[in-house]
């Protein structure tokens, strides 16, 4: 109940920011129906295969990196360890905080006697809690959410780069984003994957001048990380 009470003013705040953002971009009720759907004809059958290839490639890289990480943990251990023990080893950096917030909630989890309201935003925590209804293990559920969000985010990056440049640049953007050494964080129990998804989608719709969709994705970005608010506020 405490988490719900805390979440209500946060959601209301971002709704107000979204409304102000839409007004600043000149969105009226009459134009709202044109804000999400593109005015030009769109061939879904031609677009979806490329998106699925991009999604599959990005997800495949994340799976390979995770398998390699778990394998290294297994061979580096002096005793026999299970898969769940290996997943528990992923409690590194901020992942430990997110895992505790997912399991205990914002009201129950404290560090040095203080709550972590201002640093760790709730969107990722909410998503993983939903997935935990199907996959009880927090580390596995969190890693799955991160990998899927990253893969979907790569689709938006590919679309934005394709429309801004060409297919070669779009393919390279996804490739380098996926294999960059620090891309390991996109598959951990942290917000990097979800933040990529929300910001890339918001920027794509800003590029297309679809301000309602831009505002919605921007609000999710703001609920994911503190700097996500910069996506929502109009320039």
Predicted regions and their residues:
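Short hydrophobic/aromatic helix or loop-helix immediately within or flanking a transmembrane segment
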Residues: 89-136
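Membrane-interface transmembrane helices that cradle and orient dolichyl/undecaprenyl
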Residues: 165-168, 202-213
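Short acidic/glycine- and proline-prone juxtamembrane loop motifs at membrane-interface regions
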Residues: 187-194
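Transmembrane-helix signature of polytopic, membrane-embedded enzymes
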Residues: 137-142, 152, 157-179
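Start-transfer (signal-anchor) and selected internal transmembrane alpha helices
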Residues: 2-80
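Transmembrane-embedded, aromatic-rich helix segments that form part
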Residues: 196-197, 213-222, 227-235
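Alpha-helical transmembrane segments of multi-pass integral membrane proteins
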Residues: 116-117, 142-150, 191, 203-204, ...
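Transmembrane alpha-helices of multi-pass, membrane-embedded glycan-processing enzymes
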Residues: 119-120, 124, 128-132, 136, ...
């Amino acid at each position: 109940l405490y988490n719900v009470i805390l979440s209500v003013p946060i959601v209301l705040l971002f709704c107000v920011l979204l409304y102000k953002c839409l007004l600043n971009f000149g969105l009226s009720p009459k134009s709202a129906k044109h804000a999400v759907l593109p005015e030009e004809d769109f061939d879904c059958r031609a677009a979806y295969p490329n998106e699925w290839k991009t999604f599959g490639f990005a997800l495949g890289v994340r799976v390979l990196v995770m398998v390699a990480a778990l394998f290294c943990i297994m061979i580096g251990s002096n005793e026999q360890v299970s898969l769940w023990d290996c997943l528990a080893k992923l409690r590194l950096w901020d992942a430990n905080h997110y895992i505790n917030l997912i399991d205990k909630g914002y009201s129950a989890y404290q560090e040095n006697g203080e709550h972590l309201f201002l640093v760790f935003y709730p969107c990722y925590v909410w998503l993983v809690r939903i997935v935990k209804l199907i996959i009880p293990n927090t580390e596995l559920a969190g890693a799955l959410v991160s990998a899927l969000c990253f893969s979907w985010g790569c689709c938006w990056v590919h679309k934005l780069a394709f429309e801004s440049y060409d297919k070669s640049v779009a393919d390279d953007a996804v490739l380098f984003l996926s294999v960059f050494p620090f891309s390991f964080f996109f598959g951990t129990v942290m917000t990097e994957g979800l933040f990529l998804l929300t910001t890339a989608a918001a920027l794509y719709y800003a590029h297309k001048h679809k301000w309602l969709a831009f505002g919605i994705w921007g609000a999710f970005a703001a609920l994911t990380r503190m700097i996500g608010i910069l996506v929502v506020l109009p320039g």
